[in-house]
Amino acid sequence: MDKTFLAYQVEKKRDTFLGKVLERSISDLPKGNLTVKVFYSSLNYKDALSACGAKGVTRNYPHTPGIDAVGEVVDCLDNSFEYGDKVIITGYDLGMDTAGGFGQYIRVPSSWAVPLPAGLSMYESCLLYTSPSPRDDR
């Protein structure tokens, strides 16, 4: 039997975007060689845009937002990480058109992940991440 998990998923119904928590199957996750059990994900501006249907952020619905995630490796097909390693994934396409950190599990290319730095908790890592605002270049 396939393992299931919970995810916040946004669906498009006509011109309206609705979010709800659904049970999903691990086999529904996208292709990738790294599967991570998510412990934390932060909520930021891009997540709000994705949940509201902003085409510049997410083009394909239904979709799970969450542009960053921190958690433990449960499977790595290329051996770049071991079971139980703590990793951070942020940026790339996570939470945009690749199912993101608002699910209890994600699957991504292993090149998207970095090891959690020593001395930093998983919780702290999501508190520290902030995406640059458009005004940061002044």
Map each language-model feature to its residues.
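Cytochrome P450 core scaffold surrounding the K-helix E-X-X-R motif
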Residues: 47-48
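Short gly/ser/thr-rich secondary-structure transition/capping motifs
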Residues: 16-21, 54-55
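Glycine-rich beta-strand-centered segment in the early N-terminal region that forms part
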Residues: 25-43, 54-94, 100
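Single conserved hydrophobic/aromatic residue that forms the stacking wall/gate
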Residues: 129-138
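Short pre-catalytic strand/loop immediately N-terminal to key active-site residues, enriched for Gly-Thr
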Residues: 120-127
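Conserved hydrophobic/aromatic beta-strand scaffold that supports enzyme active sites
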Residues: 21, 70-72, 86, 105-107, ...
